């Protein structure tokens, strides 16, 4: 494995980047923690963060390396598949409120559609969102097949859709989140790959079209390294690897990975591309973080508003029982619930 040692310290890295004006302007706009990631890459301390969209799509580019993505997906699904097409994900119905850091949609040789997503935190991508995402993919395929076959269309022409979600971290700050509780329940706490599909408790044998594969990279880091020689272990190790020391050990175990890490090392000679990819990753992360925080805030506001509405309803009932007039009830609500006169009157009229 190639490990370059072109730079001795941060100052020499920044002097090098400064010779590329576009890269330097982007680099200087980064937060300190992201500057450190860039510095560590050029100092050969860290590899590129492959869980982030621009880096993943560069290393798993289907045009230049058609086998890599096929092998990764095959190892997850447990069956050999071939990626034949990268599909646009711009029209996906699922936007915002999740900490998405990588997203790719592909068509397999048998016509199936597979999405591979990497989420920063499991709490931001609950089962309801996964269900919606899978339904989106199924509807997308249905419309494509129906438009292609027209009057010859039948439902047997629709292939499976596989939703693969890789969680960079399933350990949330709040352990009462349902997704956290699911991943860390006692029977599955040491499992990093979870496969799900629709089954019947009677054993009725019907094959439905939606399947889910959920992977916890943080759990894999704890229990998965060096446990076996399966290809899935190799690919997940690649995604979980951050340092050149770990990368070197990985290449010793899987010599075919030398090519990948040599390609990563070569980017040291292309600082504009490296900084641009970091910039894209940072923007995607920040945009999704802001949206996630806004959605969390709105959910809290909605919850608090519900509590206020319930309190106001109880107060109105009490005033009705005490034979208060509607006008008195409105004035009391204004004082007790900090409402405007019009809002208080609307609540009284609604519940009187």
Model features per residue range: what roles?
Residues 234:
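A conserved mid-domain beta-alpha-beta active-site/ligand-binding segment of alpha/beta enzyme cores
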Residues 203-206, 219-220, 251, 255:
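Polybasic (Lys/Arg-rich)
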Residues 175-177, 224-229, 276:
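Short conserved micro-motifs at the rims of enzyme active sites and ligand-binding pockets
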Residues 1-211:
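Accessory alpha/beta interaction modules
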Residues 214:
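Alpha-helical segment proximal to the catalytic Tyr-Lys
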Residues 2-46, 114-119, 237-352:
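Short, charged alpha-helical interaction segments and adjacent helix-coil junctions
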Residues 52-60, 217-224, 246-250:
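Short hinge/gating elements
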């Amino acid at each position: 494995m190639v490990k370059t040692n072109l730079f001795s310290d941060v100052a020499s890295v920044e002097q090098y980047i400064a010779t590329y004006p576009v890269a330097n302007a982007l680099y200087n706009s980064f937060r300190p923690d992201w500057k450190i990631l860039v510095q560590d890459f050029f100092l050969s301390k860290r590899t590129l963060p492959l869980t982030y969209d621009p880096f993943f799509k560069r290393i798993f580019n289907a045009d230049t390396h058609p086998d890599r993505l096929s092998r990764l997906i095959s190892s997850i699904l447990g069956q050999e598949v071939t990626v034949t097409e990268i599909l646009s994900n711009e029209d996906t119905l699922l936007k915002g409120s999740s900490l998405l850091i990588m997203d790719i949609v592909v068509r397999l040789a048998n016509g199936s559609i597979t999405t591979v997503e990497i989420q920063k935190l499991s709490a931001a991508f609950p089962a309801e969102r996964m269900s919606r995402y899978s339904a989106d993919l199924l509807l997308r395929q249905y419309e494509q097949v129906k438009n292609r076959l027209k009057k010859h269309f039948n439902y047997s022409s629709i292939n499976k859709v596989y939703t693969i979600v890789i969680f960079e971290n399933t350990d949330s700050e709040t352990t009462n989140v349902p997704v956290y509780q699911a991943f860390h329940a006692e029977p599955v706490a040491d499992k990093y790959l979870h496969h799900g599909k629709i089954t019947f408790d009677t054993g009725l044998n019907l094959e439905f079209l939606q399947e889910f594969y959920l992977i916890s990279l943080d759990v894999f880091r704890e229990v998965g390294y060096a446990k076996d020689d399966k290809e899935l272990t190799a690919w997940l190790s690649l995604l979980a690897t951050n340092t050149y020391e770990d990368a070197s050990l990985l290449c010793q175990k899987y010599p075919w990975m030398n090519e990948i890490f040599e390609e990563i090392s070569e980017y040291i000679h292309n600082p504009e591309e490296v900084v641009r990819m970091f910039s894209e990753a940072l923007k995607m992360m920040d945009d999704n973080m802001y949206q996630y925080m806004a959605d969390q805030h709105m959910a809290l506001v909605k919850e608090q508003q519900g509590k206020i509405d319930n309190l106001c309803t109880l107060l109105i009932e009490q005033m009705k029982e005490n034979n208060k007039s509607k006008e008195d009830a409105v004035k009391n609500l204004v004082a007790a619930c900090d409402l405007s006169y019009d809002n208080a009157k609307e609540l009284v009229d609604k519940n009187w």
